[in-house]
Amino acid sequence: MENINVLKSDFTKLFAKDAESVFFSPGRVNLIGEHTDYNGGNVFPCALTIGTYALVRQREDKNVLVNSLNFKELGILEFSLENMIYEKQHDWANYPKGVIKTFENHGYNIPNGFEILFYGNIPNGSGLSSSASIEVLMGTILNDLFNLNINMVDIVKMCQEAENKFIGVNCGIMDQFAIGMGKENCAILLDCNTLKYSYSTIAMDGYKIVIANTNKKRGLADSKYNERRSECETALAEIQKVKNINALGELTEEEFEEVKSCISDPIKAKRAKHAVYENRRTLKAVKALEENDLTLFGKLMNDSHISLRDDYEVTGIELDTLVSLAWKSEGVIGARMTGAGFGGCTVNIVKEDCIDSFVEKVKAEYTSKIGYEPSFYVVSISDGTRKIG
């Protein structure tokens, strides 16, 4: 927990009055089920103890003033509820702005403005969903301030819509869902097709989740992400000529092997294979956890990375280096890339008394091979977005 009192005094210095309430929204990591969401499959994310804090005070006029301690150089950004358009110079503030606009589009009344101080301890560009964390935070603040009585799943859907339509990023619903619906010590098995979900308790007996950040500047992810989506769509269309399915996620491994010869391009067949096998791996991983078999869960994580590396080809030297070093480290039962790929982070399950040596060794070897240092975060699984004061 960050020192809320320090944030409160920062708020008072900035806005000359005290904050009225405090909110927290977690980041998220996907434990397994990568690039399955848009293929009609399952994902298995959890919310994290790192995230975004917001201190809020209502105003009597229609103006919204926001400031982020993570972007101090931008100062206080101000906009009016009567002119809610995307403005490049507003930078990060377009995320909360998009959520406000989406709520209004759905007929919710936002009668007056407010002041918000944001502070996040999720590294930007790490792939741990700092943007979705801010979106669900803003939705939760609006729901609370104006007594809108919206359930969290609907807040989550509107936040995804804000990112799709206002920001213009074609994301699935996993990030916002994991952040809004998170539960302490549980991961969420989510079917992205139907939004059916269930919680699985993770008994981490003596183990911790360690996130390793490649610190690679992400440039490629968006273009390659769209390319992979279209490759899978083409493969699906070819399979649909012989099999009545709506999504790759509906196939078992055996069914895929029977129909894969319908896919004319071997590259697209590899992409579709990943989508099918990763979805089944995710269901097996959940079953392993329910049977307290953390070792099998770790092996399935490793298999997931191999599939993302060889069949889906979204890893790259930085992620592969972090993962292969983790696989050689004492006390690691599973390691894989997480997120879109081409940079970002890996997720590792590491024995608690091995964490220090794991970080030290992986950092040294990665730095000597790649030329710059990775970062590490030891995290726990958190509740979803909520008011904390």
UniProtKB/Swiss-Prot annotation:
Keyword list (alphabetical) reads: ATP-binding, Carbohydrate metabolism, Cytoplasm, Galactose metabolism, Kinase, Magnesium, Metal-binding, Nucleotide-binding, Transferase
Site note Transition state stabilizer applies to R28
Query: Which processes are annotated in GO (biological process)?
Result: galactose metabolic process
User: What is the enzyme's class at the highest EC level?
Assistant: transferase
Q: Which GO terms describe its cellular component?
A: cytosol
User: What EC number(s) does its UniProt record assign?
Assistant: 2.7.1.6
Compartments annotated for it: namely: Cytoplasm
Where in the sequence is the active site? D175
Q: Which residues bind ATP?
A: S68, G125, S126, G127, L128, S129, S130, S131
Q: Which domain of life is it from?
A: Bacteria
GO terms, molecular function: ATP binding; galactokinase activity; magnesium ion binding
Q: Which residues bind Mg(2+)?
A: S131, E163
Q: Which family does it belong to?
A: Belongs to the GHMP kinase family. GalK subfamily.
**Under what name is this protein listed?**
Galactokinase
| Annotated organism of origin | Clostridium beijerinckii (strain ATCC 51743 / NCIMB 8052)
**Lineage of producing organism:** Bacteria, Bacillati, Bacillota, Clostridia, Eubacteriales
UniProt lists the gene as galK
